[in-house]
A protein has these predicted regions:
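N-terminal entry segment of metal-dependent catalytic domains or homologous docking segments
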Residues: 1-72, 136, 183-187, 244
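Short hydrophobic beta-strand that contains or immediately precedes a catalytic carboxylate
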Residues: 47-51, 131-133, 197-199
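Hydrophobic, aromatic-enriched interface-forming segments
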Residues: 127-164, 194
Length: 261
């Protein structure tokens, strides 16, 4: 199934979300999460993507809690990761409410982990401010559709940076994995025709690799309209050597706002 949001014409941003699970898996096994939400101002919105670590227990739940907490809040910097107590308690309550075999319960006690990227967007000053931990990425692509170019990739900027063991945000607070020292922050300005892409790690790495080879896939991303389009893009990425993983992509464009410069 495709996950897509098409705001009404008065909304300041056009945002569409596409996602699919690993090849061979059921949709219920999808462990990424994404969220989009307006704010108390009609010219602002917040978006987030998280990638739950398959090796940990109930990571899909943890990823969903992270993105929902971010888009419903006001934090857009490292302070977001200083205030995870409420969703950590909620994760723990939801997990404790399930009947688990002893070995599954033991694994759950170690917690879930996820990579995260989120941003707040302001249509009036055209600014965006993003925060990230791990290898989910924001890609800022500039230029007219016929002449796209990558302006910024955050928090990873080269495909070779993927594949290691990035620090991930945990659902259980531990003294030896304080997330604050791993937080990255970036900001920019969304000009006319620019797009912001928020993607989970495997798709981010492929998009960067294509760009580095001089074979950018921005036109294909521009052309996405349906689930079939996205599945074709994912199949192309996998045929190109991308590992079999959940894939998530948010595509953001700014609409004209009366009074905006």
């Amino acid at each position: 199934m495709i996950d897509a949001l098409h705001p009404v014409s008065a909304a300041p941003f056009s945002i569409e979300a596409f996602s699919c699970q690993k090849a061979g898996n059921a949709r219920s096994e999808y462990e990424d999460a994404w969220a989009i939400r307006g704010s108390d101002s009609p010219t602002r919105c917040r978006v987030a993507v998280a990638d739950g670590a398959t090796e940990s227990s109930f990571s899909a739940l943890w990823a969903a809690l992270l993105v929902e907490s971010f888009v419903r809040g006001r934090s857009h910097g490292p302070d977001f990761f200083s205030n995870l107590g409420a969703i950590r308690r909620l994760w723990r309550r939801k997990v404790r409410g399930r009947r688990l075999a002893w070995y599954a319960a033991e694994k759950a006690r170690r917690g879930a982990y996820a990579a995260f990227v989120g941003a707040s967007l302001n249509a009036v000053n055209r600014g965006w401010r993003a925060v990230a931990i791990g290898d989910c990425c924001l890609l800022h692509v500039t230029g007219a559709p016929s002449d796209r170019a990558l302006a910024k990739a955050f928090p990873l900027s080269q495909s070779e940076e993927f594949g290691s063991s990035p620090f991930l945000v945990g659902s259980v607070k531990k003294g030896d994995d304080d997330p604050l020292q791993h937080v990255r922050v970036s900001e920019g300005v969304l000009e006319e025709n620019d797009i912001l892409l928020f993607a989970s790690d495997a798709l981010s790495a492929w998009l960067l690799r294509r760009n580095e080879r001089g074979e950018p896939a921005w036109a294909a991303v521009d052309a996405l309209r349906t689930q079939e389009d996205f599945e074709a893009l994912v199949a192309q990425a996998r045929d190109d050597g991308t590992r079999n993983d959940d894939m998530t992509l948010l595509r953001v464009m700014r609409r004209s706002v009366p009074g905006a410069s």
